[in-house]
């Protein structure tokens, strides 16, 4: 909680990321309400080394096909970032990412994605991948929804 308490809400910033290995679970359509269940299923599947990591970062990728239709609450996969040297399914590509933190419930994703996309355009950049929701502080950390911290990331070019 403390690490993200000072994160400024709603401000778009850019950060260079190295390739980040992860394990994932992919479905045809993942609705927002199914994310927690699928993350638990994924965690169970990889429990041997996800427990070793401890405070691993988990997230979901917004489905680009649905996003192109203006639907923001459909996801293509859920994932746990792992660490180099541990088993993984894929890696988020290295590169520059536009980022934005927001607090509270997950029901305002469309609004936050709009702010992120506007910040990308204002910087003269273009999206180069789907929006990623990274759950920095969630129900596993606090039972107070107003303390949830989500980071949106989108690779840019």
Each model region followed by its residue ranges:
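A solvent-exposed interaction/effector surface
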Residues: 1-157
